[in-house]
Amino acid sequence: MAYFKLEFGFGRSKSEGKISDSANQADEQAVLEIPGWDFVKGEVERAKQEGRFKVAGNYLTAARSFTKFIGRSDWLFSDMTAEKLESYQRWLLGHNICQNTCSAYMRALRAMHHRALPFLNIAPFSKVFTGRTKTEKRCISQSEILQLKALPLQPGGSLSFARDIFLFSFYAMGMPFVDIAYLKKSQLRNGCIYYARHKTGQQIQVALLPAMLEIIMRYEQRDSEFVFPILSDKVENSVSSPSVSAQQHRQYTARLRQYNYNLHQVSKMLGLAKPLSSYVVRHSWASIAYLHHLDISLISKALGHTKSSTTFIYIKSLFDSDLFEANQSLMQDLGL
């Protein structure tokens, strides 16, 4: 590109500089006219080849949303002006898309914009929100865990299975669904579960409790290498491996979607104000462990967090209730 000519054109004459400047402007304009969807498809395919399927999905979802806003599929990167993106943000919020989801779309579009136009000194995303807002605490109480366990469900049914996986995750110190799905029998030894957390790569060891063994035995598959009947035996590689196929990822995401749907149905049966999900169980274990005075460093280690600050996000809202109770006790002592 002319960018390199302009940047490294030492010792040139003024006339040469003018020619290079003109050529640079022409190149910049040509880059801005790149068909957006053509570039998106290339980025999605590249991310899939690298095993970054979540990134690929984020790119695709954001591009589809922007295309719907623009109203045509032949949009160009020149359409991503600051004014247009501000309008897009208002459009998203007007369609009841939450701020964090809007921000996720903007970050995905910004990443693709930067890859397509890395050398252009333009910042169309400077006026839209790309951060993260505080979300409502997603956890249930200890009594609600006990209600869930006691809920009469048809043995062998999909709702019963979802409930059992949720409880297994809770018993296993908030073990993520992805790690449960890919859990192999070879990872169970010496009365413990040994696994590397998919998201962070942190090595975690969990003691196998009787309640966990009961659930494992309930769904035992003699001819499968997996502990639970979530993935088929055709899935040979760990989800954390770069060689994991798109087909394997699609199978996992389909199972996760079904799991969360079934948990939502169970939530209705229990009359819970906040629906159960694969995220709720981790927040719930962390919150209940903290209320039972488990050290924050141990909670962080159990969850596979690389930073304790991440764990504080899980339990931060509990501090508010602690302050409320402390103040209430103080007022009572003062006779107020």
Regions found by a protein language model. Give the residues of each.
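Short, polar N-cap/turn motifs at the start of nucleic acid-interacting alpha helices
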Residues: 186-192, 273-274, 294-315
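Short, basic (Lys/Arg/His-rich) helix/loop patches that form interaction surfaces
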Residues: 155-157, 251, 260-301
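DNA/chromatin major-groove-contacting recognition/catalytic segments
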Residues: 205-210, 219, 316-336
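Basic, Lys/Arg- and aromatic-enriched nucleic-acid-binding interface segment
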Residues: 126-138, 142-177
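N-terminal DNA-binding recognition helix of tyrosine site-specific recombinases/integrases
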Residues: 65, 94-126, 175
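Active-site/catalytic core of tyrosine-dependent DNA strand-transfer enzymes
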Residues: 209-273
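Catalytic-site neighborhood detector that most strongly recognizes the C-terminal catalytic loop/helix
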Residues: 139, 197-201, 303-328
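Basic/aromatic-enriched alpha-helical hairpins
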Residues: 8-10, 15, 19-94
